[in-house]
């Protein structure tokens, strides 16, 4: 009763302006429900030593994944100065569902290359999409596979494909959604094809690891139909916007069909006096390392214009929460759920006993340059691609992109993530400790 009176008093004290910026889930809690139609999952086997996620009951969340809105009054007189112009309203990630303004008509199918085991799933999927009257886009090099080119039974379907070439054809405004057949690398490749807005991605686990590919291909027809109809759960995987500025050293930049050197978009090329700028969208991580040199890399890291540290070691990884389970995890970083807005900085074999990985807010801007004392150059890669050399005077600016990758979930963002931790990375797997027998307990007490 006292708690209810306190809530009523707090609501009365809020001014109309303040109430407009108050989260509706401030005083919510998580409750159990037997009839909630969307959220929840059945009890399943988990490889983790922890209890399985969920049970036969269904779970209804009444609190945002971002947590409750903080009370902004402190003591009897202090409060946070309100500035409505700087307040950003963010939808609860747990409630994000895919919907269509118009029925989807075109789909891009990306298949892992040089994998014969994927030919049959690829043919079955494309045939099904054609039967659903979808326009199917594939890469031209996929159709050049001898196994597909020589298959006469697949010829009628193959003639209906729309093809494109990476780094030459812009299909960003022609694709309604993407289907990936392969592993995590296939999804990373799909992300690299879209340097702006990314269509929703449905990823089937047909590769090696599959941490980012939650769908099984066994029931692909019903799952694809559900996505086409809409109302599927999605997780917005943040990407990094990376701008590389290099000093021109007597080399002209080649531009082919709107694309610059290393496949960067022409819109990302900014030819200043003596400068060349390229821009990339990165899903996992930006890696700056020493390359083939035997010397330690020596790079300065700036945050919002301030020098925060100098990295001396094999290099440094700047990753998204999605990338925290990739190279960063191998380098000793913590794993971050993709709904946590953050950027992670992880050193690679630092020559220091106190250099721990750190997590910084998603809205900061990082800038990485060779230190003036550096004995050699450095090398940078973006999701393992577009590797290039960084010299003195060059800079790499990194911040969170406004174009996330919308990844379609099997269940929901939280359940899918912990399922991947258990099934792919075998997180916290150990033999369970046996309990004491009653006689042994009595002897110890005696």
Swiss-Prot record:
Widely expressed but not detected in skeletal muscle. The keyword Heme does not apply. Its cofactor is a divalent metal cation. Pfam families: NAD_kinase, NAD_kinase_C. The modification Phosphoserine is found at residues 46, 48, 50, 55, 64. Its EC number is 2.7.1.23. The keyword DNA-binding does not apply. Optimum pH is 7.5. It catalyses: NAD(+) + ATP = ADP + NADP(+) + H(+). Optimum temperature is 55 degrees Celsius. InterPro entries: ATP-NAD_kinase_N (IPR017438), ATP-NAD_kinase_PpnK-typ_C (IPR017437), NAD/diacylglycerol_kinase_sf (IPR016064), NADK (IPR002504). GO terms for biological process: ATP metabolic process; NAD metabolic process; NADP biosynthetic process; phosphorylation; positive regulation of insulin secretion involved in cellular response to glucose stimulus. GO terms for molecular function: ATP binding; metal ion binding; NAD+ kinase activity. One of its GO terms (cellular component) is cytosol. It is an enzyme of class 2 (transferase). Keywords: ATP-binding, Kinase, Metal-binding, NAD, NADP, Nucleotide-binding, Phosphoprotein, Transferase. Belongs to the NAD kinase family. This is NAD kinase. The gene is NADK.
